């Protein structure tokens, strides 16, 4: 992405269907890695204690069933993102800025969990677009060199995708 008019470029990208199966192939690998991280992390008490504020309910061994006990998009996104990052080793994207595309998983999943009338391809498309936005931004500018935290790109990518989903 060029540095000019990023808002328009992101809007146009989100409004355009993905044309290449390469997008989905890469996203599939990242999704599988993310699922593995979430499932393994959920077996550790210290992760669950950190990820879930409300300790009044008993946790299921399947972390995706625990999502149903959370009260908001934010709680679902936080829970899944903490579980993802606890064991997230394999999806580091190296460019001018490093990134972990799987950091977008929690926010995108929270939308589709609350809106189950979509198909899995809609979920993978949204997640792939978040990955692409974050990766494209990382190719252009190193935030760390400017004194900012690289997770801003996650916030921007996840926020853009989530906002576009809300308009559907």
Locate predicted features:
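N-terminal core-entry segment
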Residues: 1-168
């Amino acid at each position: 992405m060029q540095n000019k008019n990023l808002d328009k470029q992101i809007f146009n990208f989100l409004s355009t269907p993905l044309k290449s199966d390469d997008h989905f192939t890469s996203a599939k690998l990242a999704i599988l890695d993310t699922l593995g991280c979430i499932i393994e992390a959920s077996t550790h008490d210290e992760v669950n204690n950190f990820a879930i504020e409300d300790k009044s309910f008993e946790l299921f061994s399947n972390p995706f069933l625990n999502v149903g006990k959370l009260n908001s998009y934010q709680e679902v996104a936080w829970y899944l993102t903490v579980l993802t990052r606890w064991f997230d080793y394999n999806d580091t994207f190296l460019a001018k800025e490093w990134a972990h595309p799987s950091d977008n998983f929690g926010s995108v999943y929270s939308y589709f969990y609350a809106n189950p009338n979509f198909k899995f391809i809609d979920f993978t498309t949204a997640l792939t677009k978040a990955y692409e936005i974050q990766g494209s931004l990382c190719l252009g500018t190193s935030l760390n060199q400017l004194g900012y935290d690289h997770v801003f790109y996650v916030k921007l990518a996840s926020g853009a995708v989530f906002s576009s989903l809300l308009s559907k």
